[in-house]
Amino acid sequence: MVHLGALPGTPLYDEQRGLEGLVAQARADLVALQEAGVDAVMFGNENDRPYELEVGTASVAAMAYVIGRLRPDVRVPFGVDVLWDPCATVALAAATGAVFAREIFTGLYASDMGLWSRQAARALRDRRLYGREDLFLMFNVSAEFASPLDARSVVERARSAVFSSLADAVLVSGPMTGEPASLEVLARVKQALPDVPVLANTGVTHDNVAEVLRVADGCIVGTCLKKDGITWNPVDPQRAVAFMERVRRIREAIM
């Protein structure tokens, strides 16, 4: 993950550093991750706390500006996520040429931000309107900071997201950013969806990545690669290198 700094207009935005400061820090994180050998990177606005369910155009424009400035430095496939707005995420992906996008596309949740009522239908129609049918959509089916107002299990919600909402991949999360998803739930979701990529979305660390990759097809990693393992800190190049070295050993053992 390349967590962009707080964007203009959000409570934690650093006006002194400005947009150029955001570009500089994101570039440093991007370079560190690529030199460590990651498979892909995803740009997100995790620092825009408290989060919005409908993100303003100014934030989307700022993210597009930063990503556009970084495009010459990007050497791996990249994706985007505009928390917590699936339509803004698809729009940003279309504007920047992202290969994949992550968001909460389905479900009804009670959360710190109020009630989430997601509409995959609109987001996927936007994808079609933008001419980006190739955009790979990863559906988070167990939202952080929220509880589903749905009696169905995570497995049932995941199966439904694929069947009725055309999810390209399914993500399983822990209760908070940086906290792990249940390995048991991950395994059950993967067993139910053998032909669909299933990834761990939060809380993957140097210590548990081997267990995660035994049951999931992949993982999205942010917090454990940061300085001192703190989500809001810059990427620590040494932690990133150590993590990817461990992943390579795991892959060699599996193969």
What function would you assign to each model-found segment?
Residues 80, 85-98, 156-157, 189-194, ...:
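Catalytic cores of alpha/beta
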Residues 151-170, 177-195, 207:
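Short loop-to-alpha-helix "cap/lid" segments that border enzyme active sites
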Residues 4-13, 88, 92-169:
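Conserved anion-binding
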Residues 2-28, 78-85, 139-155, 200-206:
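Active-site mouth loops of central-metabolism enzymes
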Residues 37-62, 108-112, 167-180, 228-230:
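Glycine-rich, proline-tolerant flexible connector loops at the mouths of alpha/beta enzymes
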Residues 1-2, 41-43, 78-80, 101-103, ...:
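Hydrophobic faces of well-ordered beta-strands that scaffold small-molecule active sites
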Residues 33, 41, 101, 161, ...:
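Conserved, mostly hydrophobic/aromatic
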Residues 52-80, 118-139, 181-205, 238-254:
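Alpha-helix-loop-beta-strand connector modules within alpha/beta enzyme cores
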